[in-house]
Every structure is written in structure tokens, then in C-alpha cells.
Curated annotation (Swiss-Prot):
This is Na(+)/H(+) antiporter NhaA. The gene is nhaA. HAMAP family: NhaA. One of its GO terms (biological process) is regulation of pH. The keyword Manganese does not apply. It is found in: Cell inner membrane. One of its GO terms (cellular component) is plasma membrane. The lineage of its organism: Bacteria, Pseudomonadati, Pseudomonadota, Gammaproteobacteria, Enterobacterales.
């Protein structure tokens, strides 16, 4: 288990670097006169796929956001299932602290956003934008502190982020679903039933689940619910345990996907969506209720919610601090959780899917600026509270 956590952290740290590079490239390409037009043409390039009579025609940007991101959510589904069955969320005692922290880290940012936007019926639909945490960026910053970071603090952050991702998935399903096309929803229900049947029959071939998953993705895409949810559903049904000692299909697929997601899908998503055209940006609008609400949610709501609910859960005796971790370290890492970036941008695109380009631009700017500041403040806070290297808690051998 410790070995798996180390591998995950190392991969996410490298992914964080890739994300930063992709973001810088996107901003450069979108604003440099030599590449700006080509960048937009690349994203708007039409891509058509046919499956018999079925035709799906979208531009490249939407294929990245609806198609490739479904693979990212498949990985999340696999990770959540593993943690729930045999990982850091497998028991009530283990799960309570990160669960409480994650709930606080979603509710409080939304409340802070609404403080600025509750009276604006156009912008208040973005209340969930600051509720997300970008685990790759957060882990990337955490690893800059090396062996000073206790293993228990890393596990806490990973568990919190996994629950946070699950919360974001539920928010997308419940609050950002457009008009339902019922025949397609019926097809999605049948596809889920087929996945359940495969699981119950203990089918071990991952390809069988993925084929049904493609059908599910198409049905969900057509019915009006966001298609990326298909990935999570498929991940939950792929078997984790085997009775005859064979390799776990879920763990095998998870390991196979991690590199592709970390080094291709998420950086490509960042490259496609972080290219904000800075020309024409009005400073007054940068301090609009939308941008300020996002910044307040990420920079104040996140750490406040995580800290308060963590303290309350420990105080009431429902959980205890991880071994070798002080409460000041929980407070410091809560600041780091204000890095919203990819998931916050993803929810922005859903919240303002009507196509208001100006709202999306200023929301993205708020996310980028707040996430960058959260990364800096979180790093400085952790550097101040973590033990010096010679006194650091040594990681467990695994």
C-alpha cells in the first residue's frame, strides 16, 4: 500500500510539472500574434466519428472535454473504488477525517462564492467552481518539500482529494445536467445493467467493460447528462478483487491509465482550456463578483472549511490526526487545497455552457490567479510548519 502511494505521489508530482508547462504554453500560444490564430483553429477543428447510423460531430476542444476527460474520470472511478474497498477510506476511523475535511472544503468555498454572486442569477450558477481541488498541482507543490513531509500528511491529502473528486462528480451529475433525452437515458440504464451483469458474473476481461462503457458514454452524451460520468460508472464496476490469485483487472487498468492521464490527457486539457486571450482584459472586471467569488472560495473558503471541519471532527472524537502529523500541518495543507485549476475550469465550462465567452474568460482568470497564489501560500505555510530535515518523520518502508 505504501509503495502504491509513493508511486502515485511521484506520478502526480511529475504531472503537476506537465500541467504548469501546458498552462504556460496555452497562454503563450493564445496571446502571441504568430500562433494565436493557429491555436484557435486547432481547437475548433471539426472531428467526426461514425458508428453505423450513429454520427458524432464535435470540434477538437469538445472531444478533449467530453471524450478524453471521460478517461480521466474512469481513472478517478478506479481510484475511489480501490480506496473504499482496501485503501485509506476502507474503515470509518480512516475515512472520517478526510471525509469531514473534503465536505468542509466543498461547502465553504461555495458559500464564499455565493456571498459575492447570490443576487446575480447569471453568475451564481458557478457556485461549484471553487469547490474543486487539483490533486496533481497540490501534490506537485507538496513534493517540493521532499522528505520533510510526513507520510501521514500525504495520505491525508490524497484521501481528501479523492473524496473531493467524488463530490465534484456528484455536483456535475445533480446540478449541471441539461434537458434529459429520455430514450438515450433508457439506453444508459441498460448499459449500466450490462456492466452490473458482467461484474456479477465475475467477468475479468477489462475489454468487455470498456466496450459497454463506450455504449454508455454515447448514451449519456445523447441524453444530456455530462458524458464524462460514464468513466466513473465503468470504473466502479470493473472487478477489484479476484478469487484465484489473478492480477486485479481494476488495479491493472488503473496503473495502465495513470501515465496516459498524467502526461497526455490532463496536460492536453490544460493546453486546450487555459489559453486565455489577455488582450482586452479590463482590470475592473477582473475584480468583478465572479472573479472575486472564485478567489475568495479558493483562498479563504477552502482552508477555512477544511480546517474547521477537521478540528470539529477531532474535537468530537470521531477521528484523530494521522501518525506524525500536527494540526498546524493540516492547516497548512488546507491552503494548498485552494489550487482548483483543472477541475475548477472543467466546472466553469459546464456552468457557463451557454457560451458567454466573457464570463468564462474572467472565471478562468480568477481560477488561475487564485490557484497560483494558493500554491505559493501553501508552500510557504508548509515550509514554516514542517520539521527540519534531520528531525523529519521518516517515511515507512514498504
Amino acid at each position: 500500500m505504501i509503495t502504491m502511494i509513493r508511486r502515485f505521489i511521484q506520478l502526480d508530482a511529475a504531472a503537476g510539472v506537465m500541467l504548469m508547462m501546458a498552462t504556460v504554453l496555452a497562454l503563450t500560444f493564445a496571446n502571441w500574434s504568430v500562433t494565436a490564430a493557429g491555436y484557435q483553429q486547432f481547437l475548433m477543428m471539426p472531428v467526426e466519428m461514425r458508428f453505423g447510423a450513429l454520427e458524432i460531430n464535435k470540434n477538437l476542444l469538445l472531444w478533449i472535454n467530453d471524450g478524453l476527460m471521460a478517461i480521466f474520470f474512469l481513472l478517478i472511478g478506479l481510484e475511489v473504488k480501490r480506496e473504499l474497498v482496501e485503501g485509506s477510506l476502507a474503515s470509518r476511523q480512516q475515512a472520517m477525517l478526510p471525509l469531514a475535511a473534503a465536505v468542509g472544503g466543498m461547502v465553504f468555498p461555495a458559500l464564499f462564492f455565493l456571498l459575492f454572486n447570490a443576487n446575480d442569477e447569471v453568475t451564481r450558477v458557478g457556485w461549484a467552481i471553487p469547490a474543486a481541488t487539483d490533486i496533481a498541482f497540490a501534490i506537485g507543490v507538496l513534493t517540493l518539500l521532499g522528505k520533510r513531509v510526513p507520510a501521514g500528511l500525504k495520505v491525508f491529502l490524497l484521501a481528501l482529494a479523492i473524496i473531493d473528486d467524488l463530490g465534484a462528480i456528484l455536483i456535475i451529475a445533480l446540478f449541471y445536467t441539461q434537458q434529459i433525452f429520455w430514450p438515450a437515458l433508457g439506453g444508459a440504464v441498460l448499459a449500466v445493467a450490462a456492466l452490473a451483469y458482467l461484474n456479477r458474473q465475475q467477468v475479468r476481461k477489462t475489454s468487455a467493460y470498456l466496450l459497454v462503457g463506450i455504449v454508455l458514454w454515447v448514451c449519456i452524451l445523447k441524453c444530456g447528462v455530462h458524458a464524462t460520468l460514464a468513466g466513473v460508472i465503468v470504473g466502479f464496476f470493473i472487478p477489484l478483487r479476484t478469487s484465484n490469485g489473478e492480477p486485479s483487472p481494476a488495479v491493472t487498468l488503473e496503473h495502465g491509465l495513470q501515465t496516459w492521464v498524467a502526461f497526455l490527457i490532463i496536460p492536453l486539457f490544460a493546453f486546450a482550456n487555459a489559453g486565455i486571450v489577455l488582450q482586452g482584459i479590463v482590470l475592473e472586471k477582473l475584480f468583478s463578483p465572479l472573479s472575486l467569488g472564485i478567489a475568495a472560495g479558493l483562498l479563504v473558503g477552502k482552508p477555512l472549511g477544511i480546517t474547521l471541519l477537521s478540528w470539529l471532527t477531532i474535537r468530537l472524537g470521531y477521528a484523530r490526526l494521522p501518525a506524525g502529523v500536527g494540526f498546524s500541518q493540516i492547516v497548512a495543507v488546507s491552503v494548498l487545497c485552494g489550487i482548483g485549476f483543472t477541475m475548477s475550469i472543467f466546472i466553469t465550462l459546464l456552468a457557463f455552457s451557454g457560451g458567454d465567452a466573457e464570463l468564462i474568460t474572467y472565471a478562468k482568470l480568477g481560477i488561475l490567479l487564485a490557484s497560483g497564489l494558493a500554491a505559493l501560500l501553501g508552500y510557504l505555510a508548509l515550509r514554516g510548519v514542517l520539521p527540519v530535515l534531520d528531525k523529519a518523520v521518516q517515511p515507512c518502508k514498504g
